[in-house]
Amino acid sequence: MRGRVFDHQCLWVVRNTITSPDKIDKMLDFALENNFNHLMIQVRGRGEAFYNSEFVPRSSVIFNDLFDPLEYVLKKAHQNNIQVHAWVNMYILWSSVEPPESENHLYYIHPDWIDQKGYNEEKFNQDNDNLEDSNDGEGYYLAPHHQAVAPYLLNVLREIVEKYEVDGLHLDYIRYKDYDFGGNAFALNNYRTQSGDDASIFLSAESTVEEKSKQSASRSLKWNNYRRNSVTELVKKAKEMAMTIRPDCILSAAVKPNLYIARDRFLQEWDVWLASGYLDWVIPMNYTPSFRNFAANIDLIYENFPPKYRERIIMGISTYNQSSSEAVNKINYSKLKQFPGVSIFSYNVLEENPDYYVPIKQALVK
């Protein structure tokens, strides 16, 4: 086997690949043949588990009740010296048009945990009659600032680390859905109790621009920092938990690639997570087909991080929205900028179009 261009050559593997041993074997053959030494295996998507869990409902697309996809991947990958990171979708809960099949899904058990866009006290209740208001295209998200959400998600991560010899935990959707989310009434009431302040003015569609502008900048900053810190605290606690149970476990997160947009729009301060040591790796999803925008996101990283932090940044590159030559240019540029690794999204695209992958394969070997 020829050598790797990067120390860490990672491949995202979407959950529909790990529903049977045959599909997993085919994926692992591909990874081995193509010099990938880290696999990000999606084991929690749409609030469902692709592993044996005591409390997360099992995915309905795994037809063999005796089959444990994560256990099988770990056994086979470790035999070939490939590291496995359990890729966990965090706050996003459901993204299908049809509702979940399992009655044990959080969608049914705790609709009161789901975040809302804007604020309207009347539409919040203990059932899910009005959840369509929170979908808004991408899917339903848990409210990061709801006091019950972080303990639940931490237990999801803890169960994986305790039961499986994973080499890493990979956090995805570790952010707010968007800037105008945060209107979960229960979480807002908790914020009001803790801070003595009312944030509903910033979220209500009935509030005029003039009314919002009258609110002090310090109140707005306080509210935004509170939401931001809700996410950061979960990342911090995840790191503490992983270090206690499995000290060698690599904690990483897939993040918005523009540092400022991540922080200000999605309340995802991954610069803090990296600098504070809450994460071992950060993987910006630098999926833009535009080389100029791709490079601009890297420029922001260079402006904000000295080399000792850039050594822990793995550059995420997409294959679904650009030509293979464009993807190769971004791989080469990531090497030029001295990042220690790349993560390719995703195996599913490459598996469906082998010819597309040939130039990318050549760019990843030396």
Which residue stretches match the model-derived regions?
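The substrate-binding groove and active-site-proximal loops of carbohydrate-active enzymes
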Residues: 9-18, 54-67, 136-154, 219-230, ...
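Aromatic-lined carbohydrate-recognition surfaces of secreted/lumenal glycan-active proteins
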Residues: 83-91, 170-178, 203-206, 216-266, ...
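Substrate-binding cleft/loops of secretory-pathway carbohydrate-active enzymes
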Residues: 93-96, 170, 179, 244-283, ...
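Aromatic- and acidic-residue-enriched segments that line the glycan-binding/catalytic groove
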Residues: 53-62, 92-133, 173-213
